[in-house]
């Protein structure tokens, strides 16, 4: 069991249309593409389901060889296509609750802490069901950059990011 505040923080911060899409968020994809074309700050458009696909099936290989490794845009297109296909298959095979639970149990929280149970123990010496809303927000905030937002090594960065996540939960 996990404190529902964790899932609320996760959805409100990482994938606000989680319950409305089928694994791919066209609005997010369009917004990210528009930002990239206009040279604005890059933002992620991956849904929680796409991130689960990446976590479970290692869609993104660190080692690209041949043509794929030499043409970054082609590499990105192939990677995203794989993520989209797997995400849609996950959405047809599992419920939203199962998907978000699988994600929570596989995501990397840094410091070799994979999954919410290990992260809750590592960072707060507690169980996922006993996390406070602040602790849940810190863990979700870390997902953006686990080292930069690590509460042990970068407490100020973690505090600022936690506040952003808490704000997302209120709006």
Where on the chain are the PLM-derived regions?
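Peptidoglycan glycan-strand catalytic modules in the bacterial/periplasmic cell-wall system
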Residues: 1-171
């Amino acid at each position: 069991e996990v404190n529902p505040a964790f899932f609320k923080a996760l959805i409100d911060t990482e994938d606000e249309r989680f319950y409305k899409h089928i694994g791919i968020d066209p609005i997010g994809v369009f917004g990210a593409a528009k930002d990239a074309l206009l040279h604005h700050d890059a933002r992620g458009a991956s849904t929680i389901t796409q991130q689960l696909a990446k976590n479970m099936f290692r869609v993104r290989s660190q080692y690209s060889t041949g043509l794929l490794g030499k043409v970054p845009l082609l590499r990105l297109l192939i990677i995203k296509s794989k993520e989209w296909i797997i995400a849609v298959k996950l959405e047809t095979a599992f419920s939203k609750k199962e998907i978000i639970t699988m994600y929570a149990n596989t995501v990397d929280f840094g410091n070799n802490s994979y999954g919410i149970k290990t992260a809750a123990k590592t960072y707060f010496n507690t169980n996922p069901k006993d996390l406070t809303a602040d602790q849940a927000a810190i863990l979700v905030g870390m997902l953006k950059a686990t080292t930069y937002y690590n509460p042990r090594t970068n407490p100020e960065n973690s505090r600022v990011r936690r506040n952003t996540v808490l704000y997302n939960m209120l709006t």
